[in-house]
Amino acid sequence: MLGATAAAGALLPRAGFAAATASTADAAKLTKIGVQLYSVRGAMEKDGVESTLARIAQLGYREVEFAGYFGRTAAQIRDTLKANGLTSPSVHVPLQQLTAPDFPKFVDDAATIGHKWINLAWLAPPDRGTVAKYESHANALLAAQKVASAAGLTMGYHNHEFEFDPLGATDGYEILLERTRGSGVQFEMDMYWMSVAGKDPVSYWKRFPGQFPMIHVKDNAGAPSNEMRPVGGGSINWAALFEQRKVGGVKHFYVEHDNPPDPWASITQSMAYLKRLRFR
């Protein structure tokens, strides 16, 4: 455990904004904040990829994580990112993409765009619930990693809360971590879902150091509602968490809010909080 107070406090309620910040004298801050574009998928569909990415950049975001390309080619995505001073370190894909016949072409397109990671985004209910299913998913990630690594990319896995449902003496997340250990496969930890599951992120970072290059930064109002909130509007102690970022190897911080009433207001509020936040 991370020096008991910081580890336990990372996902516990804060005593207020001041308690979640370090003194300004020797404080660190996030210098390159990203956003998962699923948060603004409605705008991507209605207003277009180009105008949406331009607006994202105007808010101060410098990195984006894709969840679909909305009919644009890899070259079009690459050029739009460049025009707006953005980069896209990673992309989310469904399980079926990993075993699709055109996966090598997808990897080539991802490299054209500039992605470094291809992250398995989610498992549908029929794809969960047994040791055998998670072992199969680990094997799919391992096979995909061979294809991705040949093009200079890395496979990753993005968690929700269901991976932590007990499966005898283990759980799905443990199976994925252990089965892919040493393979090059990495993990994108979602802080909201870790909070819902009641899990301590840093305990995993310590057990698998350097294996979590990306995190989803989204807040949780806390039990009993577990309502998703803009960053800084919930119970997660972000300063305590970010202070341990190097343990997990975290370098990319993606704001996300799955279904906000106003997506733009949500990611604007999250950006404002993260720009103010200081930590050690």
Predicted segments, located by residue:
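A general structural detector for well-ordered alpha-helical segments in enzyme core domains, enriched
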Residues: 51-55, 76-80, 102-109, 133, ...
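N-terminal export signals
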Residues: 1-20
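C-terminal helical cap(s) of enzyme catalytic domains, especially alpha/beta-barrels
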Residues: 264-280
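Gly/Pro-rich active-site loop or hairpin
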Residues: 41, 52-53, 62, 164-170, ...
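Glycine-rich, proline-tolerant flexible connector loops at the mouths of alpha/beta enzymes
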Residues: 65-82
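C-terminal segment of N-terminal export signals and the immediately downstream linker at the start
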Residues: 14-38, 42-46
